[in-house]
Structures are given as C-alpha cells and as structure tokens.
C-alpha cells in the first residue's frame, strides 16, 4: 500500500475508534441523567433549587420532609422554587400506595414537587420478597437515588437531609 493509502487508512481507523468510544460512553451513561434533565426542565425559571433526601422509614422524618416542602412552597411560592424529594432505602416507604402520607405527597406533587423512587431499592425488595409493592403513581422512578442526588447537586440543587 502506498504512503497516502496508509495515511487514509490510519485516519479512517482513528475515526471509527473515536466514534465507537463515544457511542460506548453514551450507552454507559446512567439513566438518572434523563430524570435529572427532566427535573431541571420542570421549573427552568425557579430562583431556588432544593433536593430533600429521605432514606429512613421513620414517620417523624417523613412528616418533617413533607413539612419542609410545604413551608418552602409557602415562603417562596411554587413558581420560585424547585423541590425534589429523593427516596431510597427504607425511605421509599413514603411513596408506597398505602402510605398514611399519600394525600400530602399528592398535594405537593400538584404544586410541582417531584418525588423520586429509587429503582435499585425496588429491585432489592423484589429480589428478597418475590414481588414489588404498589407505589404512588406520582412517584418518578430513578435508577439510583444517591446518583440522582449527586446529579442534582452538580446542577445547582442544594441538598437538605431533614
């Protein structure tokens, strides 16, 4: 092969490798990125962004998270603050269909608050019990709750763990 042909072949192989690496990286991107982007798009003009972490199945902590969300909506107004509650581990109990706090969750959702449900936790429950309990249909599934918190904080959200 002549010198120009080798050069063209090298360039072609380099481009194929670069495109393959880009495609592989895109395929490996976490699905929570899509959820995070949807969260950021929900209230693009919000002056404040808050993520509330709930990882405990404690009625007092659940009530506190709900109270914080209500109080911030009242203080800033629903158009001025974006609030996302990320539940994982035992904290997903707040989003069960039979939760005693369901009416409060639904009310907050109606005011623009997002409630994220960690699918890693749901998968663990399914593996251990053989079934998935019913969850509030307003819950937004995310692949990993902690990864969702990280993505949100990297995009301007302030993390609060009441």
Task: Put a short name on every predicted segment.
Residues 4-5, 21-24:
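N-terminal twin-arginine translocation
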């Amino acid at each position: 092969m002549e010198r120009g042909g080798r050069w063209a072949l090298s360039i072609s192989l380099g481009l194929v490798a670069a495109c393959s690496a880009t495609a592989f990286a895109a395929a490996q991107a976490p699905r929570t990125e899509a959820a995070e982007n949807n969260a950021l798009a929900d209230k693009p003009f919000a002056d404040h962004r808050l993520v509330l972490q709930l990882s405990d199945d404690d009625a007092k902590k659940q009530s506190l998270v709900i109270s914080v969300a209500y109080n911030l909506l009242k203080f800033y107004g629903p158009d001025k603050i974006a609030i996302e509650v990320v539940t994982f581990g035992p904290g997903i109990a707040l989003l069960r269909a039979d939760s005693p706090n369901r009416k409060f969750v639904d009310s907050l959702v109606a005011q623009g608050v997002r409630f994220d449900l960690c699918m890693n936790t749901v998968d663990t429950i399914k593996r251990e019990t053989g079934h998935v309990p019913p969850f509030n249909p307003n819950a937004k599934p995310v692949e990993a709750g902690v990864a969702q918190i990280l993505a949100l904080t990297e995009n301007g959200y302030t993390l609060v763990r009441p």
